[in-house]
Amino acid sequence: MNLILMGLPGAGKGTQAEQIVAKYNIPHISTGDMFRAAMKAETELGLQAKSFIDKGALVPDEVTIGIVRERLSQEDCIKGFLLDGFPRTVAQASALEEIMKDLGKKIDYVLNINVDSGLLLTRLTGRRICKECGATYHLEFNPPAKADVCDKCGGELYQRSDDNEETVANRLDVNIKQTKPLLDFYEELGYLQSINGEQDINKVFADIDVLIGGLA
């Protein structure tokens, strides 16, 4: 099974990715992991990526796509993979189609975890972190026993500056605008599957499981 996982920040992508790879024993491939592995192995493309990252520049598409091609050609991807964080643009998605064709494979599903942006705002702005031990809480979903105090060490809880409402709302807006052309592209190809991410975590996975179970 060859899957792509999509979803806005706060949609619960990471949790679902963990459950998918655990059950189906396929590699979870994120852009960051691919870059790190290629740089560590000092492949030609890995060294090229490193030169851009070290300068704080964006890695060009041709380098990123080359690294993706190398990764998807590896033995552990024979039975399938879960791509996370790639592609980000229609140009990258088109390049991925070419890679899959060259490998004699195809993408089975693009799983988009759908959550209303208002709920995402609540999820993302409610996070609080302990200044002392780094424990994470959520005002609505996982509140501390005593307001603003860590249950574990008694430290003070704070909100990260990039978790404030205005910053989060802007981040979501940018993500929605960037993601829409990609979703349209995959809908046209017939790959796109929308998953209701507003349900309980286990119910979200149950819906994914029903969908992809036949591919195993």
Swiss-Prot record:
Keyword Nucleotide-binding: yes
The protein's enzyme class: transferase
Residues reported to bind Zn(2+): C130, C133, C150, C153
Keywords: ATP-binding, Cytoplasm, Kinase, Metal-binding, Nucleotide biosynthesis, Nucleotide-binding, Transferase, Zinc
Hydrolase in keyword set: no
Residues that span the membrane, as ranges: none
GO terms assigned for molecular function: adenylate kinase activity; ATP binding; zinc ion binding
Region LID: start-end pairs: 126-163
EC number(s) recorded for this UniProt protein: 2.7.4.3
A Pfam family reported for this protein in Swiss-Prot or TrEMBL: ADK
Binding positions (AMP): T31, R36, A57, L58, V59, G85, F86, P87, R88, Q92, R160, R171
Ligand binding (ATP): G10, A11, G12, K13, G14, T15, R127, T136, Y137, Q199
Entry comment, domain topic: Consists of three domains, a large central CORE domain and two small peripheral domains, NMPbind and LID, which undergo movements during catalysis. The LID domain closes over the site of phosphoryl transfer upon ATP binding. Assembling and dissambling the active center during each catalytic cycle provides an effective means to prevent ATP hydrolysis. Some bacteria have evolved a zinc-coordinating structure that stabilizes the LID domain.
Described purpose of this protein according to its UniProt entry: Catalyzes the reversible transfer of the terminal phosphate group between ATP and AMP. Plays an important role in cellular energy homeostasis and in adenine nucleotide metabolism.
Name the record gives this protein: Adenylate kinase
